[in-house]
Amino acid sequence: MALQNLTPAPGSTHATKRLGRGQGSGNGKTAGKGNKGQRARKGYNEKRGFEGGQQPLQRRLPKVGFTSKFEKPYVINVEKITAIKELSEITVATIASVHKISKSVTKIKLIGVSAKELASKVKDENVSVSGSK
């Protein structure tokens, strides 16, 4: 079997409809477009979401929410990562050394029951501790 010898399975392909080629074809005269109207004209194409004059779904539904311009901090539960408790000073770099985080992370928030105890060790303005204010 070679690539040039491949053929589609029998019955899987159909002849294309030749529009406007006589009454006997079943698609002659108006070429399956009916009589008159906007859709029968040449160059007609319907807008995405057009529902025939009915209010489109995307306009019927309410707008939802917004996108904040401020970056969300990467949240770490101190109870789950005990290695953070043993650090002498807490910065984004030192947390990255004990816990695998993406390089794109710039702000970190530490949460958990014992997170308040770590507030004195935080030496980076990009690291915050829950309930430490």
UniProtKB/Swiss-Prot annotation:
Gene Ontology biological process terms from the UniProt entry: translation
Compositionally biased tracts (Gly residues): 21-35
Family the UniProt entry places it in: Belongs to the universal ribosomal protein uL15 family.
Residues covered by region (Disordered): 1-58
Keyword Amino-acid biosynthesis listed: no
Gene for this chain: rplO
Function as written in the Swiss-Prot or TrEMBL entry: Binds to the 23S rRNA.
SUPFAM superfamilies: Ribosomal proteins L15p and L18e
GO molecular function, one term: rRNA binding
Protein name, as recorded: Large ribosomal subunit protein uL15
Keyword RNA-binding: yes
InterPro entries according to UniProt: Ribosomal_uL15, Ribosomal_uL15/eL18_sf, Ribosomal_uL15_bac-type
Organism: Campylobacter curvus (strain 525.92)
Highest rank taxon of the organism: Bacteria
GO CC terms, sorted: cytosolic large ribosomal subunit
NCBIfam families: rplO_bact
Subunit comment: Part of the 50S ribosomal subunit.
